[in-house]
Amino acid sequence: MIETLTTLEKAALLSGKNVWESRDLPRHGVPSFFMADGPHGVRKQVGSGDHLGLNASEPATCFPTSATVACSWDVELADAVGHALGREARALDVDVLLGPGLNLKRSPLGGRNFEYFSEDPYLSGKLAAAYVRGIQAEGVAATPKHYAANSQELRRMSSDSVVDERTLRELYLTAFEIVVREAAPRALMSSYNRVNGTYAHENHHLLTEILRGEWGFDGVVVSDWGGSNDPVAAIAAGANLEMPAPGLDSVRQLVEAVRDGRLDEADLTARAAEVLRLALDGRRTPRPEIDRDAHHDLARRAAEESMVLLRNEDGILPLAPGTRVALIGDMADTPRYQGAGSSAVNPTRLSSPREALAGSGLQLTAFAQGYRRHSPVDHDLERDAVAAAADADVALLYLGLDEISESEGVDRRHIDLPDAQLSLLRAVAAANPNVVVVLSAGSVVDTGWVDQTHAVLHGYLSGQAGAEAAVRLLTGDATPSGKLAETYPLALTDTPTFGRFPAEGRTSVYREGLFVGYRHAEAAGRPVRYPFGHGLSYTTFSYSDLALTDDSAEFTVTNTGSVPGAEVAQLYVATPDSAVVRPEKELKGFAKISLAPGESQRVTIAFDRYTWRHFDPTTGAWMTEEGPRRVLIGASSTDLRLSGELHVSGVTLTPSVSPATLRTAMLRGLTDDEFNDLLGITVPRDVVTGDLRRNDPLGDLSRARSPLARFAHWVLITLRRRSEAKGEPDLNIQFLYNMPFRALGKMTGGMVSDEMVDGIVDLANGHHLRGLRTVIAGFFRNRRTARDLTRQLTEAR
């Protein structure tokens, strides 16, 4: 069909019709396809749409977030959740589900970490691939996001991620590579930010050379909402769809670029053909009936298999039937079960801990609120909680991060729990030492307070059935089997990006290179609170009889305890005396095994294309280094039970840079000169001065020359502070603060053209007459162009 389309029609396919739909071509029978957010639940909005989820959405199952399910280390579970997401999307006539998110967790301060899987690319990629396979098996296109090197929320639509090629390939692209190669997603979302100076949505190296050329991706690359910069450059680079609805200004630019020879029509045709295929493939699967009870049970099982038992002193858990329990904490009554932002789901139902305890066999002696969610210490509530704790066998305390602490649009300032909760914990522990904490947080928190507890069960953000899952684990109806998918440091100062995350200027320089998460902690010799892969159980497991072949590692895992349980066996690879800088070891495989008491199972973990390789930036290719490898098997990154060595065939390397020199520099944080001398990358000067530019965020209006623009900034900041003080993040304000001027032309449904954006920037810079003239002329030109192009498209029908 693509040959029958005019240049105008092909260009029209490459931008959205409205907030959630692609543009249709009725003359050719080309339908629009409907997109919806959905990393952990389908968010199809009722009525008019908005990207941030402020308007109500249809009820859907709220599954645990990706950060939670990552702790299950269970590919089959991720596949099952993906199937459920796909079925619910299909039932709501959603053709393209915008997820899963698999950005690497570079820092625990990332405001959106709750949406992402892990600090490790291999674990992230394997789980995300399972999600994608499940979603697409139900006839819905999955959209892994945000590609690539998108680590911070501050200035997220304009920041430039400066990262060396090896780090980019091995850490920030590998998860996407695994998903593309193993699950063949039909769509992929580019990120807002620049990567080494070029916006991700128009980055030829990322989109054409790597994504399409090396990995074989043949689907649709969609911009994040408002994330397109130059539509002509985007199509030339390998992107397809500009969202949400920039009107017909982008269509005009594409048609003119083809006519003027600035854009090869073959590129336009190829990109339009990919959008056309996605549109025609949609809605071929009948709408299924949804068993909401079954999906709720799946959400509970997902939470149950993902929660991590961090501490269990004196075997206080599981709690015996009849144990007298005081239930304490605002989150015990109103659970925190998902993050804020575009992924927020309207759950089909929601269980609370108070309700879940009712049929648990435990004796609930009292409930005490203990603290107010977004307020300082309330001594009256604290006294009531202390009295309740003193009169119980166990104080069951629900703590966690509040809604303002982690949200799309804003990064975290620290990793501490709120002061009111820490004060409550101290007071309750003084009254009753048998404190069991259930923790709710989508990312790393400082757990320096654990010595005041007997047990800590980390539920992450566990979805609509998380309260039921937690109670089943607390009472022994289920055995904890979750393992951390990220490192818990002793302090924020121990993390590799401390003091420079989030980057406040125009550039975010990845000075730590390869050393993120456990890779950094081990290489720097930093002790941690809880290592990557850590998680306790009510039973114990032994490992034995490691056998290595060229293709796999085989070993035996035995349940040596008295209750059934599941173990996550982890395979790491170390390269002794490597000629290139490397982490101490890296995760290269894992398996989750369920065993009855006394049962043994032989486990095989196959080696794959990711096991031995490293990226050589000099040749621009993946290499396998000749030499010995140590294969390490264990229950966490630090609890290693078995090891063996084998020789790997490959190439003998002669490094151009001393591994020791580069390692030292990365662990300390590469300077600008070292980036240039050791990695060949020139770090751009990061000076935010002078006139505002079209790609500067509205948060920079503080330095505008126009008093009116500075007043607008004051209003923006005032509204932002008020919402934060109430503990209710205003996502519109957060979005506007980080939104560049150019996005005004992408988020207003065609009301503002690129020419008008230039005029608005002139106005902010104090060039009032020129700016006003440009805005007025641009307004009439934009309206005339939209009318003419609409007429041409209508006549073509």
Residue ranges: model-predicted function:
Residues M1-R613, P628-I633, S637, G749-G750, ...:
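Glycoside hydrolase catalytic-domain context in secreted enzymes
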Residues R609-P655:
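Terminal connector regions
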Residues G644-W714:
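Charged, amphipathic alpha-helical linkers/stalks
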Residues T682-R797:
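Long, compositionally biased, glycine/small-hydrophobic-enriched stretches that function as flexible linkers
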